[in-house]
């Protein structure tokens, strides 16, 4: 019984979203709404938008914000440099950017309010927001109860 509690505590320390890094060899089995990654990459943006859930579809139909356009330019530049063998770090505050097929394979550092969290984009992230993978809060690890655990216990005389 205690071992399962210890395992749960260990999971809590890791965070409730554990980074599932799936190797590129397994990407061939990926399907998004019945389409392979290659089909998604070759698909025009209008057709891709039709595959997304309503919230993301509505957001992209309205057009990209200027910050999102800048981020896409950085991503395209990083892809070109990666083909030449150079590694470029992409840092962004755009937590509300929807992950598109052209972002797959890159590591984007997303700001969580304190630091930049590296997020490796796999095909399974398509359609989600960047901010979903860079949590802004820590999971609470409560201390042990006792003296000085609360404000009211500060005035109790220690023995």
UniProtKB/Swiss-Prot annotation:
Alphabetical list of SUPFAM superfamilies matching this protein: Ribosomal protein S19
One matching Pfam family: Ribosomal_S19
Keyword Ligase recorded: no
MF terms in GO: rRNA binding; structural constituent of ribosome
GO cellular component, one term: cytosolic small ribosomal subunit
Superkingdom in the source lineage: Archaea
Family matches, as NCBIfam families: PRK04038.1, uS19_arch
This protein's name: Small ribosomal subunit protein uS19
Biological source species: Pyrobaculum arsenaticum (strain DSM 13514 / JCM 11321 / PZ6)
Source species taxonomy: Archaea, Thermoproteota, Thermoprotei, Thermoproteales, Thermoproteaceae
């Amino acid at each position: 019984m205690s071992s399962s509690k210890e395992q749960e505590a260990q999971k809590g320390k890791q965070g409730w979203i554990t980074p599932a890094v799936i190797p590129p060899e397994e990407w061939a089995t990926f399907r998004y709404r019945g389409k392979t990654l290659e089909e998604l990459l070759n698909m025009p943006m209008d057709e891709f938008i039709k595959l997304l859930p309503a919230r993301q579809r509505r957001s992209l139909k309205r057009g990209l914000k200027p910050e999102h356009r800048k981020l896409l330019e950085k991503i395209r530049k990083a892809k070109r440099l990666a083909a030449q063998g150079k590694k470029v770090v992409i840092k962004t505050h755009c937590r509300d950017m929807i992950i598109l097929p052209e972002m797959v394979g890159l590591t984007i550092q997303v700001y969580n309010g304190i630091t930049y969290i590296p997020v490796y984009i796999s095909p399974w992230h398509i359609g989600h927001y960047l901010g979903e993978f860079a949590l802004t809060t820590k999971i609470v690890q409560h201390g042990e109860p006792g003296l000085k655990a609360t404000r009211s216990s500060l005035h109790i005389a220690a023995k």
